[in-house]
């Protein structure tokens, strides 16, 4: 099975777009509150569901993160709708890095942001995905992140 086929099968196994959006709407504040309260490291990630984007006809979920090794400028993402790597703007970055209360207007109903910790990015990702009830994708996302971390290590 190709990467694209694997991604598409994962997306098809999710709840309907409307159900997913509703769950993210309910869970996003809970995820922000819990993870910002308990985490202290400054690595940031965002799980974004851009389901209503006019550019993309299919549901699209990207994972983006800021690697502490490279600082804030390292914003990488994998588009799970296509399997392609892309750059993703993290609109929550400043609020999280400053450790200020997140303004209501910054929290989109279909987005969740969270912190990494020294126990590992994937553990936090698992927590966040469970909160959002989209944990069917966790194995695939964890593998993407491991692959990216290996690539970065090989470059140095």
UniProtKB/Swiss-Prot annotation:
Per the record, the domain of life is Eukaryota
Which signals induce this protein?
Differentially expressed during meiosis.
What's the protein called, per UniProt? Uncharacterized protein tam5
Lineage, broadest ranks: Eukaryota, Fungi, Dikarya, Ascomycota, Taphrinomycotina
């Amino acid at each position: 099975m190709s990467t694209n086929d694997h991604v598409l099968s994962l997306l098809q196994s999710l709840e309907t777009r409307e159900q997913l959006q509703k769950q993210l709407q309910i869970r996003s504040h809970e995820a922000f509150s819990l993870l910002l309260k308990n985490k202290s490291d400054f690595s940031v990630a965002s799980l974004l569901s851009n389901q209503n984007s006019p550019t993309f006809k299919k549901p699209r979920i990207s994972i983006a993160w800021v690697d502490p090794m490279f600082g804030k400028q390292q914003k990488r993402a994998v588009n799970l709708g296509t399997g392609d790597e892309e750059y993703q703007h993290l609109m929550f970055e400043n609020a999280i890095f400053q450790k200020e209360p997140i303004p209501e207007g910054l929290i989109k109903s279909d987005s969740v942001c969270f912190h990494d910790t020294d126990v590992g990015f994937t553990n936090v990702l698992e927590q966040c995905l469970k909160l959002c009830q989209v944990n069917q994708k966790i194995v695939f996302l964890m593998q993407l992140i491991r692959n990216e971390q290996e690539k970065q290590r090989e470059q140095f």
